[in-house]
Amino acid sequence: TRKELDGKIIVNMSTIAPSENLAVKAIVEAAGGQFAEAPVSGSVVPATNGTLLILFGGEENVLNPLQKVFGILGKKTFHFGSVGKGSGAKLVLNSLLGIFGEAYSEAMLMARQFGIDTDTIIEAVGGSAMDSPMFQTKKSLWANREFPPAFALKHASKDLNLAVNELKQAGNSLPAVETVAESYRQAVAAGYGEQDVAGVYLKLDRKSVV
């Protein structure tokens, strides 16, 4: 008998744990379909411009018919391997995003505590080896201490927690990821979840004496 999903490809583009995508894959295949994951890297502007990065996990024969759609959404598709690898890659990238957000926020707050002019330290960081596309995108937020969300802190916290949990399930732990995940959990609990990911600065500032 024909199964419900015969001839259909189901693609999950949301950010969930690799283990969750593997569970969905089993359900889809049991119904006769094919499954792949394709979370994206990039926020509002890349999504609008069609310059997202597509982080694909799945079989090559599933990827091929999807390339035209991915070409509209993003500037490049990375094929990481089987289902679970694409979502794992997304957690790697978003863990870096969280760690960078924490590190730059602490650096900006440290400069304030040392009595250093914010605009001057931002220019110095931007001219150093510690510059990055993220810093250039977010530097005005730290300068103004206002954090309208491009990627909300609550979503960064969710992804960091996913990364920590996946590592624990595999019997592993990474200290920076765990520490930053806890910092972001505290920021969400303190009411900063709707701020940009760089808004962890506000939680750190509240705990400091400047």
List where the protein language model places each region.
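Helical "substrate-binding/catalytic lid" subdomain
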Residues: 85-204
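Rossmann-fold dinucleotide-binding core
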Residues: 9, 14-95
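Short, conserved loop/helix-junction motifs that constitute active-site signature segments
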Residues: 1-6
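Short, proline-enriched alpha-helix->beta-strand connector loops that line the catalytic pocket
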Residues: 7-8, 107
